[in-house]
Amino acid sequence: MRPPSRCPGMRHNDGVSDIVRVLLLGSTGSIGTQALEVIAANPDKFEVVGLAARGGNPALLAEQMAATGTRNVAVADPAAGAALDIKLAGPHAVTELVRRTEADVVLNALVGSLGLEPTLATLTAGTRLALANKESLVAGGSLVTRAAAPGQIVPVDSEHSALAQCLRGGRADEVDRLVLTASGGPFRGWTAQMLESVNPEAAKAHPTWSMGLMNTLNSASLVNKGLELIETHLLFGIPYDRIDVTVHPQSIVHSMVTFVDGSTLAQASPPDMKLPIALALGWPDRVPGAAAACDFSTASTWTFEPVDTEVFPAVELARQAGQAGGSVTAVYNAANEVAVQAFLDGRIRFPEIVRTVARAVEAADRWRAEPETVEDVLAADRWARGRAAELVGA
């Protein structure tokens, strides 16, 4: 286990400053738009050398192309490609863009399993990967970690960015436990019975973070924290039984590392994704003014409490999926995506999201073998989606 390393292949301009060439995947999403703001605010540090998106918001993508001046663009949706006269379009277009673009860092902010192949292409090319697409790591598992050189993946999630920063404070053999923090979501303190009446609008309201729809819904069910638990194990190599999750409603402390001597290092900052985005783009260097700092001149309280695992079983279910090994984590992720859509469509109640995931994971014994190819992962993904669709009555 080691913190991410310095960006390979960074070029030098005028022998004075380093300009990091950024290929941004998922540019029209929440992380992508914030990343472009970070880049625009730091033209002496970063430049955009390519954009990619699924294609659901072609108008915004057109604006981004104009603002960045790049025509090196790919979209997964052929219709969006035709509308914007983008030649590189289709299901493998984003991966092809990664292969043909010279970049110092690829920021993968795609949503869902669409990000897996671009993640592997980035790692194969030896380019630093700023990873916000947690699903590609969770689904790909050992397939992704085997493809990565030590320190090649830099996390963008605030929790894993916090862990990477805290791990600078000690050696690998000094680490005792990793502690992920969770806001608890909009339904913290609710009973299981109360959750039965939750509607999609209530689940879309996160108390502290501004995120995309899928991440917001996953945060409400704590599936997001389950995915982050799996990601933590894969990124840092710490066994699942040495990774804890605690509820911290203020979302100021983003994660902690406890060392063998009893000391704990925590990374704290007001909730703003621009900080971990900027750090991932410039790693290991910090970007001055990336986000506001904590204000200790006014009274404030930071609280911590255990996760109510009976009401919110998603975290422990993720731990079980991870300990099962193989592609069971891919099953966890894919079944959740199907169940979330069923909830949004009004076909199941909110607690049935995690119940559906649990039933899919329980039936996933055939997927315990370690994946050897992308097709192995996609096969588990397809099976899980089919199984979840049956369970939700699709």
Curated annotation (Swiss-Prot):
Binding site for Mn(2+): D157, E159, E228
Pathway connected to this protein: Isoprenoid biosynthesis; isopentenyl diphosphate biosynthesis via DXP pathway; isopentenyl diphosphate from 1-deoxy-D-xylulose 5-phosphate: step 1/6
Protein name according to UniProt: 1-deoxy-D-xylulose 5-phosphate reductoisomerase
Gene Ontology molecular function: 1-deoxy-D-xylulose-5-phosphate reductoisomerase activity; manganese ion binding; NADPH binding
Pfam families: DXP_redisom_C, DXP_reductoisom, DXPR_C
EC number from the UniProt entry: 1.1.1.267
Nucleotidyltransferase recorded as keyword: no
InterPro entries: DXP_reductoisomerase, DXP_reductoisomerase_C, DXP_reductoisomerase_N, DXPR_C, DXPR_C_sf, NAD(P)-bd_dom_sf
Encoding gene, per UniProt annotation: dxr
Family indicated by similarity: Belongs to the DXR family.
